[in-house]
Amino acid sequence: MTKNILLRLFISVLLGFNVTLTISAQDENHGHSAAALQLIKGQRQWFDTHNAAGMVYDQTPNYSLLQFNYDQKNGNFHRVYTAEKQQQANVYTEGNLNLGKVLAWGEFRFTHENERDARFNASLNDPYRGQPFFVVDSGQPSKWRHQNYHLRFRVATPIVFQHLTFGIQATYKAQLAAKQRDPRVDARFYQLQLQPGLTYALTAHDVIGASLNYVSQKEQSDMSLENMQRRLHYYELYGLGTAHKGIGIGRQTNYYGNRWGTALQYEHHTDRWKILGELFADKLVENVDISFTTPRKDAQIAERNLGFKVANSIYSKAYIHQINASFNYKSTNGITYLSQRDNTASSAGWIELHHDIRSTYKTTDATLNYVLTRLRDSEYSWQGAIGIDYQGLDDTYLLPVSVKKSKNAMLFADYRNNFIVGKTMNQRLLLDVQLMMKRAFSGKYAYRGANNDLITVREMEPLDEAFLTADAQGARLSLTYSQLLRQQTNINGYVKLAFSELHSKAKTFNSRRNVSVTLGVNF
């Protein structure tokens, strides 16, 4: 009950914040087309860092938006825990406001999602969040229902004492999920993130910044059976297919952890050039306990991230050139515990006997893209982009040695054209065409344990590796029509239709399709 009240309070606060944005924005601008709003967001270099104190250097104008979206995905070209059919409806609101003495930005998203034909996962809300210790079932297709709440805001000062700015970003997430087939699961994930920061202007053209990152997160997973006459098998995962097989009602699992990190930023800017770089590092320790009444420590992950981002923009009267690059290396140690039951009256519970690192997980992510924008007044006439996203996975179970590796790249080319349909009502038609190509350079899965007959080894992990090492190609097409709702106002309404398909020639897969419809207004 308390959590529901807090969520409603967060929603009310943010909606009230956006109403304020609306009133202020109507007095200051002539409204934003869909392309104009994309252009505004695409120029926010500090927004993509961990430091909210840099908001003043982005010089983002006031805006506010509210949109409703329906999204549907289907097809068998997906990773092993992803559902074959997904239906998602969400409401999203966002706004930016400069009050003079403070700069503020905020967003809220509520998502309801139904999944059909999801396999294996029987424990976590999101099995891809980097936690390898969870429970799976025998792979029978199941339905899932998700409700996700996401609230984030940034506040910052303008430049004070001639050189300094201060800011903070806060994020709250609540994700609820329920599996609809035995063994059932009720999974609840909560996360609170705080990121305070500051910047210091060295000269009129150079700025340095520093920020801290703290995250507290918790997930509770409670398994159950509705049909007690049928006892089903489940599997407790310990890495790369290694699992303990169980039968019956399942287990209660408690995940809780904290992340600490820091980031440094440097910006150099002139009238025609702006470059911003960020170096960041953090560490997450997350514990895995079984049972809520008499908890037994089962496992722990120790995750480290190290990365950087560089955003470079060159401006002229007619064009903007942007080159963006990022790199992140994540290294995770999977630690398992050996415990003994202590049933003495004075200290009933579990005694830890031993723990050690049994598995390691290494992920390398890198991106590089170039964007060319042809300006037209406060929006763009057209925009082109090319880029590549690379990911390398290198996972190892130490004894007996098992490995899972892959190297992938996704290449894309994107073109957007913003057609003027009418000037009186600011009518625009935005066409967006994107071509995609996924290429797998290498990969393998090799299990060398003693339980080759487990379904986690025979089917689950090989199926996931097959996706990671499959080539694919696809395209995405979207149309966005926008116009003023009333001539004397600054409120632009828009409707967006999007379709994409990714097709693979691999024997195991076929394709994945995505259809999306969005209705919204912005100010």
Residue ranges and their predicted role:
Residues 242-386:
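Long, internal scaffold/assembly segments composed of regular secondary structure
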Residues 60-64, 100-106, 162-166, 204-208, ...:
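Outer-envelope beta-barrel architecture signal
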Residues 91-97, 151-157, 194-200, 262-268, ...:
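Residues on the lipid-exposed face of transmembrane beta-strands in outer-membrane beta-barrel proteins
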Residues 85-91, 145-151, 188-192, 256-262, ...:
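Residues that define the transmembrane beta-barrel architecture of outer-membrane proteins
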Residues 29-31, 204, 511-523:
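Outer-membrane beta-barrel "beta-signal"
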Residues 120-136, 180, 214-256, 285-300, ...:
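Short, flexible helix-coil linker/hinge segments at the edges of structured domains or between repeats
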Residues 68-74, 110-114, 159, 172-176, ...:
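Transmembrane beta-strands of outer-membrane beta-barrel pores
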Residues 76-82, 117-123, 178-185, 221-227, ...:
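Outer-membrane beta-barrel translocator domains and adjoining extracellular loop/strand segments
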